[in-house]
Regions:
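Short Fe-S-cluster ligation motifs
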Residues: 1-15, 54-74, 274-282
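Short flanking/linker segments adjacent to small metal-binding domains or redox-active Cys/His motifs
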Residues: 4-9, 24-29, 83-86, 90
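Canonical Radical SAM [4Fe-4S] cluster-binding loop centered on the CxxxCxxC motif
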Residues: 15-48, 256, 278-282
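Residue-level detector of family-conserved "landmark" positions at structurally sensitive sites
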Residues: 40, 73, 102, 160-161, ...
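Conserved AdoMet/S-adenosylmethionine-binding subsite of the radical SAM
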Residues: 51-211, 218
Length: 282
């Protein structure tokens, strides 16, 4: 589940992740473009070769057979195939599995209401705080901000990810704007700042560990309790770990997608000082 990434959702659990083809965005820096852009870009046509027919029942059986605790819709943009996702989530929830979305967050209130009965968690990409940058991707900044607010308001566990791209969204001002917005929704929302690599049609240099650390420090200074740096395992110090915001003890130690220690398996409180840690731990 850390690969989604979710750091406060059943750490170390296996998640069966499914997806489809297509996206309502056309980001030139997409890291999943082979599946997300298949329907509009001939260069991504190989994505169609990954498709296989499977029923919701078979999906859930596969998850149970492999010891998964979660079923997650991801890879392309799940919002464009929400009916299909719900067909799977209904079966998964009945079988005792948790369900989650990994999305660009460009959702309407109607689809959020449709998904809410089945979802435990919702990961949303907050790509930039510049409206013109979102328009270049094919979306609207305000729609994404409203989705983050709504997902939190209706009780979904929300984690926000920003892919930090040199020259696109990595200015100090923009990182502050992003941090302050998330803080305005809830200081408990984890913010993942993740490293970009050159892909698809974008050729900026890769994000440095130093830049991720700087971004994380801004998030912490803005008041966020849980800030993580991702995609550079072993190079960002303790920013892969979950710390108690009160006593600062390490509660979940990670390296990349792997959980090394987890002190929240049986409790949602810090075993050292008793502070309740926001998340879905059991």
């Amino acid at each position: 589940v850390e690969k989604k990434p979710f750091n406060h959702l059943l750490p170390g659990s296996l998640a069966l992740t499914f997806g489809m083809l297509g996206c309502n965005f056309h980001c030139d820096f997409c890291q999943n473009w082979v599946t997300s852009q298949t329907l509009r870009d001939p260069a991504a046509s190989i994505g169609a070769e990954y498709i296989q027919r499977i029923s919701p029942e078979q999906m859930v059986q596969t998850a149970k057979r492999n010891g998964c605790n979660l079923v997650v819709s991801s890879y392309n943009e799940p919002l464009i195939t929400s009916e299909w996702a719900v067909a799977i989530f209904k079966q998964a929830k009945a079988a005792g599995l948790r369900c989650a979305y990994v999305s660009n967050g460009h959702a309407t209130p109607e689809v959020m209401e449709y998904l809410a009965p089945y979802l435990t968690a919702y990961k949303i990409d907050l790509k930039t705080m510049q409206a013109n940058q979102y328009r270049q991707c094919g979306g609207k900044l305000e729609a994404v901000l409203e989705s983050i607010q709504l997902a939190h308001k209706i009780g979904l566990w929300v984690e926000v990810v920003t892919l930090v791209i040199p020259g696109f969204n990595d200015s100090t001002q923009e990182l502050w704007d992003t941090s302050r917005f998330i803080t305005s929704v809830s200081r408990d929302i984890p913010w993942h700042v993740t490293a970009y690599h050159s892909d698809y049609k974008h050729d900026a240099p890769p994000t440095s560990a130093k830049k991720l650390q700087e971004a994380a420090e801004i998030g912490q200074e803005a008041g966020l309790k849980f800030v993580y740096a991702g995609n550079l395992p072993g190079r960002v110090g303790s920013l892969e770990d979950t710390h108690c915001p009160n006593c600062l003890k390490v509660l979940v130690k990670r390296r990349g997608y792997y959980v090394i220690e987890n002190h929240l398996k049986e409790t949602n409180a810090c075993p050292y000082c008793g502070t309740v840690i926001a998340g879905v731990w059991q």
